[in-house]
C-alpha cells in the first residue's frame, strides 16, 4: 500500500524530476526547444506556461509566458519578435521556437508548466554555433629559389575550435594536391605552414580551409617562385637605365654650360683693351684757312703739351745757332699724335737745323706753318 502511494506521488509531481536536453544550432537558422505536458484543461483558466533563459554569465530572464489566456512574447529587447510557441500549447505542446538564432540566444532554457497545483519542468541547453569568417591568406618570406616561405591563414571570428587545412589546387592534369614534401605545420598556430628550400616546382595555387561544427570557409593564394639570376638581371637592368639617364643629363648640362660660356665670351670680346695695340700714327695736315688753323692749333696744343714744349725748345735752338735770312718766312712743324707719357723729347742735330734753314727758301712766303690736328 505504501509503495503504491509513493508511485502516485511521483507521477503526480513528475515535473519535479524534469528532463534535460542539449541542442546545437548554427546562427541565423531556426531552432525549436521541446516542452510537452498533459496538464491542459481548456475549460479552466488555471494553466500557466513560462520559458526562462539563464545565459552563460548566470543572468536569468523571462522569454515568453502564457497566463490568463494571453501570450506575452515581447518581454526582452534582445529576443523581441523572434520567439513564439511552436504548436498548440493548450493541447500539451509548449515547445519554444526561435528564429533567426543569434549568438546571444545561447544558454540554459527552462520550461515551466503549472495547472491546478501540478507542475512540469523541462530543461534545454542551447548552443549557438557561428561559422568561421572568410579567412585571409598571406605570404611571409621571399619568393626566390632556396628561400623559406610561410603560408598564413586566419579567421577573425567563429566558434572555437577552428581547424585550418592547407592544400594545393590542381591546375594541370597530374599535379599533386598535397603540400610539398619539405613543408612543416606550426602546431602552435595551425594556420601557418612553412615551405622550406623553395624550388620552381613549389609554384602554384594554395588553398586554406577554416572549419568548425557550423561550417567552413576558404581562401586561395598564388605562389610564384623566381630564379635568383632573373632577379639579378632585373636589378642590373634598372641600375643601367638609371645610370644612362644620369649620364645623358650630365652631357646635356655640359653642352648648355659650354654654349653659355661661348656666348659670354663673344659679348665681352669687343670691350677688351689690348695692351700691345699700336698707338694712332701722327699725320701732318695743311690747314685751308686761318680759322681752321687756329682751331687745329688750339686742339693740338691742349692735347699734346709735351710735344709743344719739345717744338719750342727746337725753335730756340734754331734762333741761337742760325739767324733767319731777311725776307724769308720760317716754318714751324708740330707733331700730330697722342700724348705719350714718360717719353723723352727727341734731340735736334745740327745737320737737321741746317736743312731746316735752307728749306724755307723753296716755299712761298705766303704759306703758313702746318699745325697739328
Curated annotation (Swiss-Prot):
Residues 19-235 are extracellular. One of its GO terms (cellular component) is cell surface. Residues 288-314 have a biased composition (Low complexity). Disulfide bonds join 35-111, 153-208. It is found in: Cell junction, Tight junction; Cell membrane. InterPro entries: CLMP, Ig-like_dom, Ig-like_dom_sf, Ig-like_fold, Ig_sub, Ig_sub2, Ig_V-set. GO terms for biological process: digestive tract development; postsynaptic modulation of chemical synaptic transmission. Residues 257-373 are cytoplasmic. Residues 1-18 form the signal peptide. Residues 264-373 are annotated as: Disordered. Residues 19-127, 135-224 form the Ig-like C2-type domain. Predominantly expressed in epithelial cells within different tissues and in the white adipose tissue. Expressed at high levels in small intestine and placenta, at intermediate levels in the heart, skeletal muscle, colon, spleen, kidney and lung and at low levels in the liver and peripheral blood leukocytes. Highly abundant in the intestine during embryo and fetal development (at protein level). Glycans are attached at residues 74, 197. Residues 355-373 have a biased composition (Polar residues). The chain crosses the membrane at residues 236-256. CDD domains: Ig (cd00096), IgV_CAR_like (cd20960). Induction: Up-regulated in mature adipocytes and adipocyte tissue of obese individuals. Changing residue 124 to D: In CSBS; affects subcellular location; the mutant protein is localized in the cytoplasm. Keywords: Cell junction, Cell membrane, Disease variant, Disulfide bond, Glycoprotein, Immunoglobulin domain, Membrane, Repeat, Signal, Tight junction, Transmembrane, Transmembrane helix. Pfam families: Ig_2, V-set. Residues 264-281 have a biased composition (Basic and acidic residues). It is a single-pass type I membrane protein. May be involved in the cell-cell adhesion. May play a role in adipocyte differentiation and development of obesity. Is required for normal small intestine development. It is linked to Congenital short bowel syndrome: A disease characterized by a shortened small intestine, intestinal malrotation, and malabsorption. The mean length of the small intestine in CSBS patients is approximately 50 cm, compared with a normal length at birth of 190-280 cm. Patients with CSBS may develop severe malnutrition as a result of the hugely reduced absorptive surface of the small intestine. Infants require parenteral nutrition for survival. This is CXADR-like membrane protein. It comes from Homo sapiens (Human). The lineage of its organism: Eukaryota, Metazoa, Chordata, Craniata, Vertebrata.
